[in-house]
């Protein structure tokens, strides 16, 4: 997301979390220090630095090198999960997961988010995987990794910008209370992470066929 919209959205999400009675803790690495609970100034610094190319993109693989260099870094889903789990944070929200890229049979391009979901005990609330990915293969790989994907108020997994992917949700939760029970049981059994897949509002969503045409045209 371009600056300054990235900063505006991050602060708006924090405000929404507070309004719901929870405590937000935006995660990143600032001057080599992994930080769970960035200040508004630190969010501004990382948001602006991303546009300037001075902020590193950090998955699990990249965090130690960023710390050693005392550099700034914005965490991917996998990086955020790692730091959240280390701090005892059990739930985080993001737009969408990384997963299996289109053409992965040749490129082997699969996001580090998938193995991290199997490893770190964090519930990731999102609109499933990003639309540019191969969504059926992503769903299949998550199944192989033993990662539950819970459709929140839907029997069909969302597709980031779209409420519909054509992929059946492996399990569903009708409301937050039901989702919380699934999360609690999963963590009690020490089974790693899981995904709570929340579709975008239908009035704001985009038809998946339109998204696919745009992606195919760009590839």
Name what the model sees in each region.
Residues 195-197, 201-219:
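A C-terminal functional module that forms or caps the active site or interfaces directly
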Residues 24-29, 73-76, 91-96, 102, ...:
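General beta-strand structural signal in soluble alpha/beta enzymes
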Residues 31-33, 98, 153-158, 198-204:
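Glycine-rich beta-alpha junction loops
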Residues 163-187:
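Anionic-ligand binding region
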């Amino acid at each position: 997301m371009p600056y300054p919209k990235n900063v505006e959205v991050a602060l708006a999400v924090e405000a929404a979390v507070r309004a719901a009675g929870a405590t937000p803790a935006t995660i990143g690495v600032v001057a080599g220090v992994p930080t769970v609970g960035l200040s508004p100034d630190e969010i501004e610094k990382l948001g602006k630095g991303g546009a300037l190319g001075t902020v590193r993109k950090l998955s699990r693989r990249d965090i130690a090198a960023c710390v050693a260099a005392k550099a700034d870094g914005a965490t991917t889903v996998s990086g955020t999960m790692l730091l959240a789990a280390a701090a005892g944070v059990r739930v985080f929200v993001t737009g969408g997961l990384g997963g299996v890229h289109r053409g992965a049979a040749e490129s082997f391009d699969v996001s580090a988010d998938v193995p991290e979901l199997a490893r770190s005990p964090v519930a990731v609330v999102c609109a499933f995987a990003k639309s540019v990915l191969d969504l059926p293969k992503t769903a299949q790989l998550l199944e192989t990794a033993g990662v539950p994907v819970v459709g929140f108020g839907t029997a069909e997994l969302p597709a980031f910008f779209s409420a519909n992917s054509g992929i059946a949700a492996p399990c569903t939760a009708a409301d937050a209370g039901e989702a919380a029970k699934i999360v609690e049981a999963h963590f009690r059994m020490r089974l790693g992470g899981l995904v709570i897949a929340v579709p975008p509002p239908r009035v704001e969503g985009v038809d998946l066929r339109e998204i696919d045409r745009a992606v195919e045209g760009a590839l």
